[in-house]
Amino acid sequence: MIRHLIYSSQKRAIWFSLLVFVGLLFTLGCEANANIEDSSTVIPTVQSSAANVTVTSTLVPSPTVNRTSSCIPDGEFNSDTDYFPDKANVNYANGFSLEYHNSFKILTINATDSTADQSFVLVQCGAPIPDTIFPTITIPIESVFLSSTTQYPSFIELGSVAKIKGIGQAAFISSKEIIDHVKTNEVVEFAANFEVGTEVVIESNPDVLMSNGFSDPAYTKLAQLNIPVINWMDWQETSALGRAEWMLVTSSLLNQELTSRVFINTIAKNYEEITEIAAQARSDVVALAGSAFQGTFYAPGGASYVANLLKDANIEYVWSQTPDTGSLYLDLESVIAEGVTADIWINAPTQWTTIEEGLSEDPRYGELESVKQSNVWTHTLLVNEQGADDYFERAASRPDLLLADLVKIAHPDLMNEHKFEWYQQLPNK
């Protein structure tokens, strides 16, 4: 009986202790939760150099997509929030890089033989401007001046043609959408005579000016006046896919990385599939490429994107062993000597409409085997009424179609269903 009472007392004591322990845990848990709730409403203050930015003091859900047409609302900025959930990796291009931070990106245009490194801080609208020595650009941009025709396609693809407020030369535009935009809106032509009109640019004060990549004192002057001038160096890429990837420079300014990433991935997939088809060719084809202007024959260097396009098309290029990424400057005697046995000639002078016309310009072209076999090609299939060639506008952004054209020229049996996009064979007369 005593043993039973002792056992019962011990049992009650144990249960009582357990109840006290559980109650203590519950109390501590409630206090911890209360502390967590308190901390969630207090976000560290972010020092801002922008007077119109207010730091939030309440928890705001993180964005699931980039802001392509709006700013961070006043009072909702949070330094811990990633405002760029849609990012882009640079997989093919060598000429630029993108670095992402929570509320800003760093766009770097790499140095070339003629230009220095450039870095720009792209700050999400509504976010504070970070302390930096680099020029800052508020994104998404609302206005842009474009110097090169290869810059147009990305704005078309990203649905942002309306942001184009200035163009270099209207005469070189081939896209109907851009032509219509220029005609119906107050779009400034700022380099009609191949000279940048700085006063016109300054008056318009665009968010960004994209240069043509060539050195010009006018660009330096504009940059000194706080108009960001981005060097557009796509033409120095060594691969066609690398050149197409310059679309990411545009999309980073528009916060449209998601759209550009899908577009580029699709093109890259197409390109790889066409390369695999070209590899099945059973015959060796040698190509001469380039054209003469004022006594000098300009040919793609052996490390250029054109030379690598020919390689991917399973075409042997006459000057493939040269290390140049740009153009070769040759005399016609060298061209005849080295290219005399080439099977095809691509990128022949665009002003020629017949082979006969070319021979009248210089009879020595008649020594070339490609001329004898009437296998001379120009990229003039899509030239509009004002003489603008779509090849110089859209081909850089669609290397898959460009590669398909080249494969069809050299290995027509492998691309029966492909219709030429830019190239056409010159008739004899």
Q: What are these model-predicted stretches?
A:
Residues 1-11:
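N-terminal secretory signal peptides that target proteins for export/translocation
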Residues 26-29:
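C-terminal motif of bacterial Sec signal peptides marking the signal peptidase cleavage site
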Residues 105-204, 208-213:
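A short, structured surface patch at a secondary-structure boundary
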Residues 31-152, 259-288, 355, 409, ...:
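Bacterial Sec-exported substrate-binding components of ABC uptake systems
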Residues 186, 197-199, 203-296, 320-321, ...:
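Extracytoplasmic substrate-binding proteins
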Residues 276-362:
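Flexible, glycine-rich surface segments
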Residues 11-22:
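Sec-dependent N-terminal signal peptides
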Residues 326-341, 345-413:
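C-terminal soluble interaction/assembly domains
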